């Protein structure tokens, strides 16, 4: 096996990594230098806490897209005292030069673009394997896979029947990886679970899993819902998608978006940003929604709200953004027009019924771009095999908006690691004053100057002069 392939390597101090090519480290380091200038929130936290090192003693198992922006996050956590092991949370989202830069700096990382499902779960296990009888004590998650692996594995220690009847290829790989681990170490997962002080979750889908566990009483440690910080969901989800969706579509297909008919399925924050993205390049955009409030919002913004089933034969570009499954079904797929582009910007790959297309003829155009011939003779263009198009076919959100999200992540990790005993096994949101702090840290970079309240004005509206300025119930 070549040294540059994804084989386990040893660096100084016996740091291990599995990446595509360590020779990409210099390229990654150059892009990291640019990203740091665009991520003022993270750099401000480094400056504030680098001497205090509030994360000293934290052993963080990180499962989040291994991009250049994530590399800045990782190095911020390390600068604040943490030990880190990292894997990507998506088989296509890794930027190999970013992984190489992190590996070359001595941080264990297990990620490469285009992982198999077996590799994906093997790498997720690697972030939990600390050696020398040590275990992680914190999880930083995106989509809930690392958290879910620990919890499902703990259940399987007691009852292997939970690993029966997988529903898809991903579950086949997941269940197999758990069985293999249990054969080597029958109490592995329960040891990990008992050592975790808290988890911070990045995205909508992972947060939904946490709330589900909280509701049924199975959440084994405190969690902070980073996604619903205003400076995450209203920025990363909205403005990030507004730029990265069309970036992915254009890099993958080179098509002219102007004049096309596009359908965005789901009009939450991600859907809103996606719709703006397509409209901004001149597409006629329609929205499909189940929620009457979101549907009304879309209508008031000038989008036509439709049912997928009624328009499927007329749409040029399909984008799913729901967090649900089987949104675009086989029946929808086989009715699509010739050269329709089909993609997803939700976290998981099950919004589009890609499995139902397997019997048909596939022609790979380039990585993450497939031409599929339907029974009608029409061909559709499937992007990133139905996984995140902006990370599979492009490089994800810009650094500046990710600085908002990742500053929240660092603050959440500090809070749970240093104050974990104050939290029950429930899901929490960072308080308003920290949300406002994250925003403040990013204003200078874009030349924004805040107006200041007078004492009389502050008293009149009954808020502190320095904030927070809105109630917890306020909807931005």
UniProtKB/Swiss-Prot annotation:
Stored InterPro entries: Adenosylhomocyst_ase-like_sf, Adenosylhomocysteinase-like, Ado_hCys_hydrolase_NAD-bd, NAD(P)-bd_dom_sf, S-Ado-L-homoCys_hydrolase_CS
EC number, as in UniProt: 3.13.2.1
CC terms in the record's Gene Ontology section: cytosol
Cofactor annotation: NAD(+)
PROSITE patterns the record matches: ADOHCYASE_1, ADOHCYASE_2
Source organism: Prochlorococcus marinus (strain MIT 9211)
Subcellular location as annotated: Cytoplasm
Domain of life: Bacteria
PANTHER family given in the database record: ADENOSYLHOMOCYSTEINASE (PTHR23420:SF0)
Principal subcellular localisation of the protein: cytoplasm
Keywords: Cytoplasm, Hydrolase, NAD, One-carbon metabolism
Protein family (similarity comment): Belongs to the adenosylhomocysteinase family.
Native organism taxonomy: Bacteria, Bacillati, Cyanobacteriota, Cyanophyceae, Synechococcales
One record GO biological process: one-carbon metabolic process
Cofactor binding note: Binds 1 NAD(+) per subunit.
GO molecular function: adenosylhomocysteinase activity
Catalyzed reactions per annotation: S-adenosyl-L-homocysteine + H2O = L-homocysteine + adenosine
Any Pfam family the entry gives: AdoHcyase_NAD
Top-level EC class: hydrolase
Name of the protein: Adenosylhomocysteinase
Amino-acid positions noted as binding substrate in the UniProt annotation, renumbered to this chain: 67, 142, 202, 232, 236
Biological role stated in the UniProt entry: May play a key role in the regulation of the intracellular concentration of adenosylhomocysteine.
Amino-acid positions noted as binding NAD(+) in the UniProt annotation, renumbered to this chain: 203-205, 237, 266-271, 289, 324, 345-347, 390
Pathway in which this enzyme or protein is active: Amino-acid biosynthesis; L-homocysteine biosynthesis; L-homocysteine from S-adenosyl-L-homocysteine: step 1/1
């Amino acid at each position: 096996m070549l040294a540059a392939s994804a084989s386990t390597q040893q660096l100084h101090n016996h740091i291990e990594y599995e990446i595509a090519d360590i020779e990409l480290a210099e390229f990654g380091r150059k892009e990291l230098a640019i990203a740091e200038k665009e991520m003022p929130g993270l750099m401000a936290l480094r400056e504030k806490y680098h001497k205090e090192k509030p994360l000293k003693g934290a052993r963080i198992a990180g499962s989040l897209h291994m991009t250049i922006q994530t590399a800045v996050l990782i190095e911020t956590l390390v600068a604040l005292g943490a030990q880190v092991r990292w894997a990507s949370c998506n088989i296509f989202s890794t930027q190999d030069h970013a992984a190489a830069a992190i590996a070359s700096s001595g941080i264990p990382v297990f990620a490469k673009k285009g992982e198999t499902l077996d590799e994906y779960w093997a790498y997720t296990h690697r972030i939990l394997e600390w050696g020398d009888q040590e275990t992680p004590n914190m999880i930083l998650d995106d989509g809930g896979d690392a958290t879910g692996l620990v919890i499902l594995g703990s259940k399987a220690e007691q009852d292997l029947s939970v690993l029966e009847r997988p529903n898809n290829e991903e579950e086949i790989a997941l269940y197999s990886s758990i069985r293999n681990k249990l054969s080597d170490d029958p109490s592995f997962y329960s040891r990990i679970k008992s050592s975790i002080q808290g988890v911070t979750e990045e995205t909508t889908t992972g947060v939904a899993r946490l709330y589900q566990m909280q509701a049924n009483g199975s959440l084994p440690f405190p969690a902070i819902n980073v996604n619903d910080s205003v400076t995450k969901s209203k920025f990363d989800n909205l403005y990030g998608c507004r730029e990265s969706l069309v970036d992915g579509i254009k890099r993958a297909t080179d098509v002219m978006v102007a004049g096309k008919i596009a359908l965005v399925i789901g009009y939450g924050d991600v859907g809103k940003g996606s719709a703006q993205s397509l409209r901004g390049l001149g597409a006629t955009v329609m929205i499909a929604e189940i929620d009457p409030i979101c549907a009304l919002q879309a209508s008031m913004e000038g989008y036509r709200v439709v049912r997928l089933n009624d328009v499927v034969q007329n749409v040029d570009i399909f984008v799913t953004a729901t967090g649900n499954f089987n949104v675009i079904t086989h029946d929808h797929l086989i009715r699509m027009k010739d050269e329709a582009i089909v993609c997803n910007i939700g976290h998981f790959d099950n919004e589009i019924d890609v499995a139902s297309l397997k019997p048909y003829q596939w022609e790979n155009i380039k990585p993450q771009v497939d031409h599929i011939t339907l029974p009608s003779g029409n061909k559709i263009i499937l992007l990133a095999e139905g996984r995140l198009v902006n990370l599979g076919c492009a490089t994800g959100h810009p650094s500046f908006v990710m600085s908002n999200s990742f500053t929240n992540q660092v603050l959440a990790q500090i809070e749970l690691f240093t104050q974990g005993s104050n939290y029950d096994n429930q899901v929490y949101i960072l308080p308003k004053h920290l949300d406002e702090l994250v925003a403040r840290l990013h204003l200078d970079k874009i030349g924004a100057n805040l107006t200041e309240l007078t004492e009389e004005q502050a008293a009149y509206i009954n808020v502190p002069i320095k904030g927070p300025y809105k109630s917890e119930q306020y909807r931005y």
